[in-house]
Amino acid sequence: MSIYLIALLPVLGWGFMPIIANLRKSTPEEQLLGTSISALLFALILFWILSPEITVLSFIVSFISGIFWSFGQLLQFKGIAASSVAKAMPISNGTQLVGATLFAVLVFREWQTVTAVIIGVVAVILILIGVVMTGFQKRGNHITESVSFHVYGIVILSSFFLTLYVVTNQLFDVTGFSIILPQAIGMLTCAIGINLAKKTAISRKNVTFNLMTGLSWSIANLGMFLATAVLGVATSFSISQACVIVATIGGILIFKQKKSPLEWTFILSGILLIMVGVVFLSLLK
């Protein structure tokens, strides 16, 4: 039972992360810097406790994956700033799932049977339909897509980098807790570079506030590591993706966004389709 509670940490951590980041009027760059600082502090504590062996290869690969994360997370924050948590996060989660799936198929050749291909294609279609449905909005007597192509573009590009962040270590077979510290160093290095390149003053208060954003992300990341070790990739992966429920519904309720019954129907149906797609994908892992 306790391991399933640990498996819920990614659900809550990744679900509340974008909500926490947007509780205060911070720029995406400030959100990224605060998150990265907190992630590095958390990684240093874990390194001190666990003392994992870090090789030159694992350091370089994990450092690069951290850079990919920074670009992806910055764009995700920008996508949220241009829309809302409830609108951007289903797109982000869904397109990351599709991106990771395509990478697994094209690079790792994971779908070797006709059955696997059918299940995988159905899963991807369900996820994409679910993503679009969560963005529907009632205007008069009509239901229209409320998310602009501009926001879709930002979030999809974000998902491209976040997918690279996820698969880079897998590509070089770098696993375990040795990933966390060099990855966090890469995250912070890139975040500092992004803020320096912006050449505008940052708010220390905003950066400090977003240490909580980083803590939420770090706890989720640790929970995912622990759950995967015991439950396996398929189960822990499926559970963790429920973070889209927390982010979407939590974003609507906490930021007091008014939704009509019809809009709620589309949002909840879209989330359900995404989760069904996730379950189908987990069958292939």
UniProtKB/Swiss-Prot annotation:
Any single GO CC term annotated in Swiss-Prot or TrEMBL for this entry: plasma membrane
Keyword Cell membrane assigned: yes
Membrane topology: Multi-pass membrane protein
Protein keywords: Cell membrane, Membrane, Sugar transport, Transmembrane, Transmembrane helix, Transport
Subcellular localization: Cell membrane
Family: Belongs to the GRP transporter (TC 2.A.7.5) family.
Stated name of the protein: Putative sugar uptake protein lmo0424
UniProt source species: Listeria monocytogenes serovar 1/2a (strain ATCC BAA-679 / EGD-e)
